[in-house]
Amino acid sequence: MHLHKARSLLLWYGLVKPMIVKRAAAAQTTMKKTTDNSISRRLFITGSLAFTAMPALAQDGDIFSEQMIWRDPSIPVAGNVKGDLTIVEYSDFNCPYCRKVFPVMQKVVREDGNIRLVYKLWPIFGPASVYSAQLVLATRGQGKYVQAYDALMSSTSRVTEAGADKTLAAAGIDVSRAKQDLQKNKSEIETILKRHHAQADGFSFQGTPSFIIGKFRLFGAHDEEVFKQAIADARKMLKGG
């Protein structure tokens, strides 16, 4: 893909004028009641997410705060944990385009070497996807969230509940313990998935995979060139360029 095409894509996913994201208010009601100073007044500006433009809204407990989008403490980080740029990916293990883009994103992050990659599970492809997402979140107790994610996203066929168990076991994960941890932490895990869904809905994502790259949004599976251009532009914006 030529650079001018990549830049056109970046212009496409960047919004041209400020707008109020009304859907975010509806999404937030699935988590808690909102007030006049809630997500309903969050703005997007010229392709960027207005995290810093509206500090009064970026408070603890706000699922659209910079902290909860980029640095949610409940989600382990892949890539460079001290990287200067964060990429957040909303994905589903049964999304064919998520599986297609998985090795591309891994290569881009590995070659860059300075990116924090945050996998946020957004299971929208049915009960098997929900089960798989819950089970992977339950592997955090073993310190194997990223390993579990990588194993299931490397699947070449639809992930079933039995298939998820088998794949994770083959990847060296204690599935019995993960299931026990899932039952023990079911409420917290369900809250995390609801939060991811509310965030994705608030950002007007139409499906998986969807990305937040710095303060840009990007939809769908793309090639290396598009991701690298998005990363370069995101770094430029964060540096005030």
Tell me the role of every PLM-derived stretch.
Residues 39, 170-241:
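C-terminal cap of thioredoxin/glutaredoxin-like
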Residues 86-171, 203-206, 237:
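Structural alpha/beta surface segment adjacent to cysteine/selenocysteine redox centers
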Residues 32-51:
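N-terminal secretory signal peptides and thylakoid transit peptides that target proteins
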Residues 26, 56-60:
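Boundary at the C-terminal end of the N-terminal hydrophobic targeting segment
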Residues 67-85:
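A short beta-strand-turn-helix
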